[in-house]
Amino acid sequence: MNYLKSGLACILVSSMWAAFALVASFYGWWMSPVVETGDAAGFSQFTREQLARKNQGNSAFLVIENGEVFDSGYFSAVGANPVDAETMFSLASMSKWVTAIGVMLLVEQGKLDLDKPVNHYLTRWKLPDHEFSNPVLVRHLLSHTSGLEDGLGFGDYDLDEDLPTLEESLAEPRASGSQGVRFVISVEPGTEFNYSGGGYLILQLLIEEVSGIGFVDFIQQQIFDPLNMQRSTFVYSQNDSNTSPSFDVNGEVAISYKYAVAAATGLSASASDLGRLSLAMMPANRSHLTRVSENMRVPAGLMFGLPLWGLGEILYAETNLGDFVYGHDGANEPAINTALRINPDTNDAIIVLVTGHKRLATYIGYEWVLWQTGYPDVLSTNLVISSSVRPMLIGLFLIVASFLFHGWFTRPTMNHLGTRVI
């Protein structure tokens, strides 16, 4: 009976330790930054080494410290044109962040209400009826909580193909795989986070309907021109002489495609221009974009009750002052990966643009967030869980060993008369 009780106690304590080790990993307990806190030069050097060693394609990075550009670096594939501060990269889903800024500017101008149904503003196309009681609001589309289920499967277009109109893309979107893509509301709007590229195609239409001009022109007039972002465009840019081609993971030039879903994935921009935009969004700038940025950081998309998404941007980790490190990442085939992170507490930021590696920009962004805050970011779940394995196993070994030793030294023995002694 004593052995059974000890065994059950060992299982209980082991389970409690394993759960604690796992939960603690999400608070960064088992992780260490790659350089000391405050060592911006050290982190820049780490970024340089990572890009030089791990990526065979093109890449660029820019580090902002205390509201000023601190460092930058540019790396070119063998035989490729040199990359510089003005080289445009395809940003993939980071495009959504800029689109969301455009939507929030319309809110700032009083032309759009986040809490009105999106169909209230649409005339050229409307979201189909659904079975749920809540309408799809503008804020739902921004925060991926609209209930839309579109499979993320929007296909690319060959360079010799004509792009469909916005209405054609909404009515008959091209799928990237064998599964068709349709706009279906499958969950009660406003109740669950479900990443939706299609929601940003609807926001593209919303911007056009509310502003009265084309999406590309609106972003150009409202964001790019005021910030002197001359190396940013939602128009296909591969004909530009200083646009990076797409590379695969082996450093070979890959086929370039066009995107019909401009608002979700069609932006190309330089590291220098993204630096200008990041600086304009920071508290130190005290501009209308600073107010927009503050409104975008309000948690709107939750997972397991924890803040994951604001109004168009990722909330990577909580800062020391209770705000959020924010920004957006992007990824596309064959090996496009981009990352942008801003810490409003310190007016620091990092921008990493990569073509030739599927996850390197996101990894560097994760290390930057850990270095800035001591917490892992929300995109690093695999790294977080992996960090808990070693302390979990060490703890389990010590727990089991303790119970075994206790059982050994408290086991019944026989005295010289043959009587059991406890």
Predicted regions and their residues:
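Extracytoplasmic/periplasmic, Sec-exported soluble proteins
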Residues: 35-42, 53-55, 59, 83-98, ...
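Short, solvent-exposed turn/loop segments enriched in Gly/Ser/Thr/Pro and often Arg
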Residues: 65, 69, 118, 234-241
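Surface-exposed beta-strand edges and their flanking turn/coil or helix-capping segments
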Residues: 84-88, 104, 127, 156, ...
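Short, surface-exposed loop or secondary-structure junction motifs
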Residues: 130-327, 333
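Catalytic loop of the DD-peptidase/beta-lactamase superfamily, centered on the K-T-G motif
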Residues: 2-74, 255-422
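Extracytoplasmic/secreted proteins, especially bacterial periplasmic and envelope-associated proteins
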Residues: 42, 46, 93, 98, ...
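Active-site-proximal loop and beta-strand segments within enzyme catalytic domains
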Residues: 17-28, 71, 79-196, 361
